[in-house]
Amino acid sequence: MINQIDIKTRERMEACIQTFHNNITNIKTGRASPTLLHNIYIEYFGSKTPLRQVSNIIVEDSHTLKINVFDDSITSLIRKSILNSNLDLNPVLQGKDIIIPIPRLTEERRKQLIKVIRGDAESSRIQIRNIRRDANDKVKRLLKDKIISEDNEHTSQSKIQIMTNEYIKKIDCILEKKEKELMKF
């Protein structure tokens, strides 16, 4: 029973870390990266299709992305989707390809982005703590229902706390890495 709680807790914390990582990966750092466009979808044959399924996204240089579109008829749709994505990118049509210059970040914009990612990190830490609280509540219920002993409860809560500390450290590491990446350019 306690093992199930530990497994579920670890899965939920891992999902939280993954969500945080995915969210801050999409924050542009002034450097060209195909992941910048991973959340771009276009309307293709009546369904929303990820951009990476209908094109190749290539890094031309550190400040330029090039999109090789498989179907020329959707080039303008892709351009429109990028413009509407709130990524502050200005795609330029060049034949059947789309060129996306990545603007350099200003110092002010870097500071804004750092505030945003720190806020995301704090939200993720709160989620981790809430997961810990839920797991501890389940353990306490098991004790109350006399399914486990007090020793087992303390051991389980210690494991959950160690797990919590581990995942909060992971959040801090991801945050620190992204902050360094933002300040580098």
Curated annotation (Swiss-Prot):
Signal peptide: none annotated. GO terms for molecular function: ribosomal large subunit binding. GO terms for biological process: cytoplasmic translational termination. CDD domains: RRF (cd00520). It holds the Pfam family RRF. GO terms for cellular component: cytosol. Its main location: cytoplasm. It comes from the Bacteria. It is found in: Cytoplasm. Keywords: Cytoplasm, Protein biosynthesis. The keyword Glycoprotein does not apply. Belongs to the RRF family. Responsible for the release of ribosomes from messenger RNA at the termination of protein biosynthesis. May increase the efficiency of translation by recycling ribosomes from one round of translation to another. This is Ribosome-recycling factor. It comes from Buchnera aphidicola subsp. Acyrthosiphon pisum (strain APS). The gene is frr.
